[in-house]
């Protein structure tokens, strides 16, 4: 028990130590993006900034793994803008997709309330993990991100579906995701450069938020991951749909 606690403390401490220089890299990169530089330099700065955020996401995965294993993860309920969350995910997907040049389609229902109450960072991380996984294991074809909502007495069920035309998974590999730290298929993950945390951590995070994940997959044909997460709606604010969210537009392409 003491050894396990020491390991968990080490993981938490080292993760926090890594965050400090990463935040500096991301912050400086973001500031330089606003400076007057040529297009090539701006693109390089953008790639550095996004790569830093990507690495920060990996560090967060390590922290999440530790918190989930020890049942110490806390949810932060705060107002957030679902449009901003989806835009941030799509911006990251652009970077991941540069080399593969897959077709990425974003399909958002028009009547999703934009003023939600929940843990926006975890919602972002979950959707980001799904997109990352889809791009990582797809070499040809494309990825579709669907976002919708269904009204409930407590607010809405946020519905997200990510469908890809990638290498797929067997039923055995899908079942293996119940184990938080499981690479699903060592050869498969090594080929894609992953460590196998994304889907498994997302599933446990979704369960903690009283939601659920469903995976349908056919080897060599593709995978569809569907999630439903209950979210409250801020009824004391004007209801703004995703499609009418002012200057913060969802990116469709």
Q: What label would you give each PLM region?
A:
Residues 76-81, 98, 103-114:
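Conserved catalytic submotifs in the C-terminal HATPase_c
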Residues 107, 156, 172, 226-253:
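Disordered, acidic interdomain junction associated with two-component signaling
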Residues 66-77:
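Helix-loop junction within the histidine kinase core
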Residues 28, 53-65, 85:
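Coiled-coil phosphoacceptor/dimerization helix of two-component systems
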Residues 210-216:
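Glycine-rich ATP-binding loops of the HATPase_c
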Residues 1-34, 53:
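Primarily the dimerization/phosphotransfer
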Residues 169-183:
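Short conserved segment of the HATPase_c
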